[in-house]
From Swiss-Prot:
SMART domains in the cross-refs: WHy
GO biological process annotation, one example: response to high light intensity
Pfam annotation, one family: LEA_2
Gene Ontology CC entries for this record: cytosol
Origin species: Arabidopsis thaliana
Gene: LEA14
Name assigned to this protein: Probable desiccation-related protein LEA14
Family assignment from sequence similarity: Belongs to the LEA type 2 family.
């Protein structure tokens, strides 16, 4: 009897892994705003939905790392839905306080940029499967603002 249950579990697990799932990628990370307290970057994420109906996004959570340190994080509750059989573009604002940027002076160096890693968890609600988190990550360099960005 136990082996029958194990076979049933394996069968269901195999079928669930074969179900197509939405996939995403970070397409760009750009400077959005500079103010007295922080720098705001905008991460552009594209997500493809293989299903013929829209899928609600429950939450977007993200962490922004540089030089092995977390320099920004946040959550965006209920940001909308993924379009049916289409690509959906999502904008994720990432705010980094200047106090943290100044602590990264070693990484900034001569070229006035920071190396980053952005990790995003896109939590969606799939029928039958339930809540499912799509992990999306990106690594790259971002130029820091200069005085001309302020004026």
């Amino acid at each position: 009897m136990a082996s029958l249950l194990d076979k049933a579990k394996d069968f269901v697990a195999d079928k669930l892994t074969a179900i197509p799932k939405p996939e995403g990628s970070v397409t760009d990370v750009d400077l959005k705003d500079v103010n007295r307290d922080s720098v705001e970057y905008l991460a552009k994420v594209s997500v493809t939905n293989p299903y013929s109906h829209s899928i609600p996004i429950c939450e977007i959570s993200f962490t922004f790392h540089s030089a092995g340190r977390e320099i920004g994080k946040g959550k965006i509750p209920d940001p909308g839905s993924l379009k049916a059989k289409d690509m959906t573009a999502l904008d994720i604002p990432v705010v980094v306080p200047y106090s943290i940027l100044f602590n990264l002076a070693r990484d900034v160096g001569v070229d006035w940029d920071i190396d980053y890693e952005l990790q995003i968890g896109l939590t969606i609600d799939l029928p039958v499967v339930g809540e499912f988190t799509i992990p999306i990550s990106s690594k790259g360099e971002i130029k820091l603002p200069t005085f001309k960005d302020f004026f």
